[in-house]
Every structure is written in structure tokens, then in C-alpha cells.
Amino acid sequence: GNGIEKGAYGLPWYVNDGPTYWNTELMQKCGLDPNKIPTTWDEYFAAGDTIVQNCKDVYLGTTMGYNTEDLMTAGVKSFMNDDHSKYTFNDEAGVKQISRFVELYKKGGIPPEALDSSWSQAADLFQRGNLVSMAGSAYSADGFKQNAPDLYKNLAVGPRISNDGKSASVAYEMLGISANSKHPDVAIDFARFVTNEKNQIEFDKKASVFPSAKGGSG
């Protein structure tokens, strides 16, 4: 399990990785080489500039740099000081990274929706052909295949953008029990049932995610 402050406790359920999806048809249209998928932040922002120069109403993506991963992979080393009394991500690397997103947004390489877009809105824009790239999940491809078959035919999958060469990005989901639960024993039994190795694997196969249970990768 995973302990949290003040005695809260959660049972690990599944983990997910986040690749970057690219619309190769739009890449060609906007002057990019589909055989050279951007992998670093310099390459990513250079692609954005190329899109702005060659296409109208087409954008690089909705990523705005506010995720911790977008800062850490650009060189930010820490987010808080040792006693957790002050944020520290406004260092040189953090300011540079956020500034690059702001500049690309002002140029028109990032859509207005990016300021308050949800995950589903980003997928909608990508499926409609307004975005050249999208930071997605392993299961996103199934949605593209079902909802946007033309996009799926022109889909390329690249690593998460990173300056450190570490493209894997594992996000995990847990099941926890509310302290105010009227039936905590039943809730705990249910959480254990859902997260046991057998049921994790069955769920993960259908959802295109990865098990957290020991031995589940087999």
C-alpha cells in the first residue's frame, strides 16, 4: 500500500505511462518531417515555430508546462525547500521553460483552449485535426482508433518530451477508504478485491494500462 500523511492509506491499483502522439499528416502539411519525431524540448518548441510559420488554425499541442513532469524534464531539480515552507521551482530552468510556453502561445502555436482545457478537450482537438501532437496515455490509441480512424491511420507514437533522455512517466492510481465511510470493512474488502493481482491483470488488459501488483507484469 501507499501511506499518506495523517495515517491515510491507499491500495495501489494500476499504473500508466504517457507517450506523445503525433499526427503525421499534419506534420507534413505544416513543414515537419514525420520521420524525425521531436524528443527534446528544443526540438518540440522548434516544431511549434515551424507550425506557426506554415499553418493557420493548427497548433502544436495544448501542453502549457504546468505539469511537474514538464518542468522536471526541462531541468527543474526541486519544487519545495527541505522544510516545505517555500516553493523553489522558479529557478532558472523553471522560468525558462514556462517562458517558452508563453512565447509559443503568444505566437499562436498553442490554442486558447489550452489555458483551461481538460484532458478530454485536448483529445477532441487532436481528433478534429487541430493539434499536431498530444501528450496522451497508453490507452489513448484505442480511443483514436474508435473515434478518429483517419487520424489513427496517420498516427505516430513518440516518447514523452524530455531533456534528460528519461521518457518514461509513470502515473499511478490507488483506491482509498474515506474516514467517513459508513461501511469501512466492506469498503476495504472491495478495494482488496479490485486490486488483487488476478483482477488487476484482467482490468489492465481491457483498459490498456499496467498492473501495480508484484508479479503482474508477467
What do these predicted ranges mean?
Residues 45-50, 86-115:
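Glycine-centered hinge/linker elements that transmit conformational signals in sensory
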Residues 55-58, 128-137:
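Alpha-to-beta junction loops
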